[in-house]
Amino acid sequence: MAVLSAVIYGLMPLMAVNIYAGGVNAVTLVALRNILALPVLAIIAVIKDKSLKIPLKALPGISEIAVLGMAATPLLLLSSYNYIDSSVSTVIHFIYPILVVVGGILLFKEKATSFGIAGLLCCTVGVMLFYDSKQSFDLAGIIPAALSGVTCAAYVMMLSRFKYKNIPIFTFSFYVSAIGGGVTLLVAAVTNRLTLPVGVGDWGLCLLFALSVTVGAVLLYQKSIFIIGGSKASVLSALEPTTSLFVGILIMGEGVSVCKLIGSALVIASGLIITFEGIIGKKQ
């Protein structure tokens, strides 16, 4: 699930470029990706789980998860694109798997396994190899990109320790998306950056984006955290920049360096190591 989620996330730039061409800005897109997915999530939740009810005691935790993961993280990351290249932002953002693993060990006394450490090292070195020193490097972009990694790590750790995991995943995702969408819509309105799509085709692209990311990638990632834990899921999510790289080469005609190819191989290796650890654990 985490791997499939990372692949879908890796396709986001391709979809976003076409949406931006229609006049929609990044802040509005984050809001729309949450809001447009709500009817689908609600219908599936009602059909599958017969209800959208949740314990009132779960609402504060859901709200914190929503603000961190569905509002703060994407808003910070997307704002960094105004000052530095998206590939640089992605590399800086991916400090979050390190923060999740280290945070789990220091704050929650999780045990560090040899497989986990090896996977984390491969992931870290692999993502760093995506960095190109010739690209723009502005502190105004570095700070929000780094903060997006911090908020994402907090989101993953909170999600992996969420007490009410018995809440059906579609119901959970509905409330997380509703709160996240409301917060980002408010930010867009207050900052006067609300630029809605104009044509039917533009709305269609935004809907496709919302269904792919919110109903697809986000839901799969949330479920994977519940199943395998935040540390492993965050390392596996490093396949996202690798997917973006191959999309850029095969579809957008972008160039590729030896470092990026080696980085991709290391990221894939980190995923295989984590997967192998899971197989060994089941056999034992």
Predicted feature descriptions by range:
Residues 22-72, 99-100, 150-158, 173-192, ...:
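Transmembrane alpha-helices of multi-pass small-molecule transport proteins
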Residues 103, 112-132, 152, 238, ...:
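Hydrophobic transmembrane alpha-helices of multi-pass small-molecule transport proteins
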Residues 1-28, 32, 134-161, 183, ...:
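Glycine-/small-residue-enriched transmembrane alpha-helix faces in small-molecule transporters
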Residues 6, 32, 74, 88-95, ...:
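Helix-helix packing/entry segments at the starts of transmembrane helices
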Residues 40, 45, 77, 96-118, ...:
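C-terminal transmembrane-helix exit sites in multi-pass transporters
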Residues 8, 13, 45-87, 92-93, ...:
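Specific transmembrane alpha-helical segments of multi-pass solute transporters/efflux pumps
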Residues 11, 15, 22, 37-57, ...:
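Membrane-interface helix-cap regions at the ends of transmembrane helices
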Residues 19, 29, 33, 80, ...:
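Hydrophobic/aromatic residues within transmembrane alpha-helices
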